[in-house]
Curated annotation (Swiss-Prot):
UniProt GO BP: karyogamy involved in conjugation with cellular fusion; nuclear membrane fusion involved in karyogamy
Main subcellular location of this protein, as a coarse class: endoplasmic reticulum
Lumenal membrane side: 23-445, 491-493
Organism: Meyerozyma guilliermondii (strain ATCC 6260 / CBS 566 / DSM 6381 / JCM 1539 / NBRC 10279 / NRRL Y-324)
Name of protein: Nuclear fusion protein KAR5
Task of the protein: Required for nuclear membrane fusion during karyogamy.
Cytoplasmic topological segments: 467-469
Alphabetically ordered keywords of this record: Endoplasmic reticulum, Glycoprotein, Karyogamy, Membrane, Nucleus, Signal, Transmembrane, Transmembrane helix
Length: 493
């Protein structure tokens, strides 16, 4: 058992040591895209200078536009920055342009390789983040331009609508004046018609009287009619002149020309808006096509990663061999730990054995004390039972002497049974706790069982003794009397 615990402790210690040493450097060397973004906003430093060669390509076209060599060199420079800031030694080739040798030496040490691979991965995340932000800004700018164009069109439309409303009001005012003139002319024409009708009627009457007067009046009326007709024509000509004046005024004010210009501008704006919308749709289609190309490139990258993983597995096998060599260096430490743990476990087990022995001794003492107390209680109960038997014998003698005097039998039986019941109840009370502990039966249940058993025994013995001396009939009557006495005294139990 000690050897098994020793082996488990050594394995756990080795795994924890390896895990902590590898992950502490990984946590110290890894950068997220948000952290790189934040660093690039600060004054230029080591990390910023390492990211500067690929930053513009990342912003414009994403990680796929970055040359793998540039990405590799930036990752190496970032790793060097971290090593220098942490005070960790690193291969000298990483300070020069001999990146192949640098990467090969970084792969020999898990901590170095973790830092380099984390930076290489974070560069991809950073490029994807900044390229997407750039695309987002371009789309927001395009949307802002479309919004501005639409706002200009809306403003021009409202201005045109306002001017059209003003012109409409002016035209309605002119038409109202014309309508008033027409109403006046209508009234005059109606009055003239009524006057003509009256005159015709008068003419019909006077025609026969004076034809010459009629012809003169006809000529006069014709003259008046021509005069009125000329007046109507003049009014219409005046209205036409007013209309020409209004149109000329509108032309002079440039309202008609403004309406034509607003119309042409609206058409141009709508045409520009349509062209911008078509351009936006074409850009969206091209973006979708580019996303498809990126997905295809991702598939090829995954295939390249699979081949790279195969090479990595070979390197891992080499690393395992190196770890086996390194394991011999830990052997001395393991031996020291094993001896120390063995000593600790020996002390611990000895202490546990001592405490266990003390606990067992205490248990033995407690069991012995309990058993002795139970034996003493049993002996006491047996003595009390024997005393109760002697008392019962004396009571029985009294009982037999009572039967000699038949007249006092009920009273004697009552006294006898009552004293017997008291003794029986006392015996049961004294012994029930002991036998309930031995038989593992509840005290109340055991007391009831013993009481009813003793009562039945008493009745049976009483019936047998009385029947032997007085016969079965008298015995039956006496037993009934005893049962009545017992029934009447059950509450005293």
């Amino acid at each position: 058992m000690k050897k098994i615990l020793r082996l488990v402790f050594i394995l756990v210690y080795t795994n924890i040591s390896t895990f902590v040493s590898a992950h502490e450097l990984e946590d110290a060397a890894s950068f997220t895209a948000d952290e790189l973004d934040r660093l690039l906003e600060d004054p230029p430093g080591c990390i910023q200078l390492a990211m500067r060669p690929i930053f513009e390509k990342c912003v414009l076209n994403g990680i796929h536009a970055v040359d793998p060599k540039d990405r590799r060199s930036s990752a190496i420079e970032m790793s060097v920055c971290e090593f220098e800031s942490a005070g960790v030694e690193y291969p000298a080739e990483c300070s020069t342009t001999d990146y192949d040798t640098c990467i090969w030496k970084l792969g020999l040490v898990p901590q170095y390789w973790t830092t380099f691979s984390g930076n290489y991965r974070d560069i991809g995340l950073f490029c994807e983040g900044v390229s997407r932000n750039n695309e987002k800004e371009q789309l927001v700018l395009l949307y802002s331009n479309i919004t501005k164009v639409f706002a200009g069109f809306r403003h021009a439309f409202y201005e045109s609508y306002s001017k059209s409303q003003e012109m409409k009001d002016e035209m309605e005012e002119g038409f109202s004046r014309w309508s008033a003139d027409f109403d006046i002319a209508k009234d005059q024409h109606k009055e003239f018609y009524e006057f003509v009708a009256k005159q015709q009627e008068h003419i019909k009457i006077e025609l026969m009287k004076n034809q010459k007067v009629i012809f003169d009046f006809h000529d006069e009326q014709e003259v008046r009619f021509n005069s009125y007709s000329n007046h109507i024509v003049d009014v219409i000509d005046s209205m036409a002149v007013d209309l020409d004046i209004i149109l000329a005024k509108l032309a002079d004010d440039g309202i008609i020309e403004d309406m034509e210009n607003q119309k042409s501008k609206s058409l141009d704006i709508m045409k520009s808006y349509s062209e911008d919308a078509e351009l936006t749709l074409s850009r969206i289609v091209s973006e979708l096509e580019r996303v498809g190309i990126i997905q295809k490139n991702d598939v090829s990258i995954v295939e390249n990663l699979n081949s790279g993983l195969a090479d990595t597995s070979n390197k891992v096998s080499k690393l395992n061999k190196d770890f086996e060599d390194l394991d011999s260096h830990f052997q001395h430490t393991k031996d020291l730990i094993e001896s120390e743990v063995s000593f600790l476990f020996a002390n611990l087990i000895g202490e546990m054995e001592t405490k266990l022995s003390q606990a067992l001794e205490n248990v033995d003492d407690r069991i012995e004390l309990h058993f002795v107390s139970q034996l003493e209680f049993l002996d006491k109960s047996l003595n009390e039972t024997w005393e109760a038997i002697l008392t019962f014998k004396q009571d029985w003698q009294i009982f037999t002497s009572i039967f000699e005097n038949f007249e006092n039998i009920p009273k004697s039986i009552s006294h006898f049974v009552t004293s017997g019941l008291y003794k029986t109840n006392e015996i049961l009370t004294q012994t029930s706790y002991f036998w309930s502990t031995i038989l593992n039966i509840p005290v109340s249940l055991l007391s009831n069982i013993l009481r009813y058993t003793m009562a039945a025994s008493w009745i049976a013995i009483l019936f047998i003794l009385i029947s032997l001396r007085y016969g079965s009939t008298k015995s039956f009557l006496l037993v009934i009397m005893v049962l009545l006495v017992v029934f009447l005294n059950t509450h005293r139990w």
